[in-house]
C-alpha cells in the first residue's frame, strides 16, 4: 500500500518485500558458499537451487508491482515503461516483470518446444540480457549488480523505489 502526503511516498508493503528479499539473499549467500566448497556445484544442484530462490524473489517483486498498480489505478503496460533503465535499454521494471514471468513459464515453454505469442516479449527481454537459457535469472540478477554479489535487496530494491516514485508523477491511464 502506498501512502502519499506532501510529495512524500511511504510504501508500507516495501518493508515486507525487503524482508522477504533479505531472507532470499541469505539463502543465496549460503548457496554461494556451498558453490565455493563444491567440486561439482552443477551436479550438486546448487545452481538450480540459486535460480529457484532468485525466481521467487522476482515473482514477489512482480506481485508488489501489481499491488501498486491496483492501488493507483495505473495501466500495467505504461507503468512497466517507467523508472530507471536497465543497461539493455529496457526499463528495469519491465526486466523484473519479464524475469518473474520467465520463472513462472519457462518450463512449460521448453516442454512444448515453443514460446507462445504472449511470452515472446518476456523471452526477448531475458535472452537479450542472459544470452543463454540455463541460469537465465542468475544472469539477469547479475546484470543489475555492481559487484559479484547476487543480492536481490541491494540490486533490485533501489529500482523498485525509483519505479514507485515514477508512478506518482505519471498521469493515470
Locations of regions flagged by a protein language model:
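Sparse recognition of residues in long alpha-helices and their boundaries
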Residues: 77, 115-117
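Non-transmembrane, amphipathic alpha-helical segments
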Residues: 5, 9-12, 16, 42-53, ...
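Generic structural signal for well-ordered, non-transmembrane alpha-helical segments
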Residues: 15-18, 22, 55, 59, ...
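Histidine-centered, metal-coordinating catalytic motifs and their short helical/loop contexts
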Residues: 89-115
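Long, hydrophobic, amphipathic alpha-helical segments used as structural scaffolds
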Residues: 65-76, 104-111, 171
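Short, contiguous, well-structured surface segments enriched in hydrophobic/aromatic residues
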Residues: 36-90
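Charged alpha-helical initiation segments
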Residues: 1-44
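Amphipathic, Lys/Arg-enriched alpha-helical patches that create a basic surface
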Residues: 21-34, 55, 63-71, 119-173
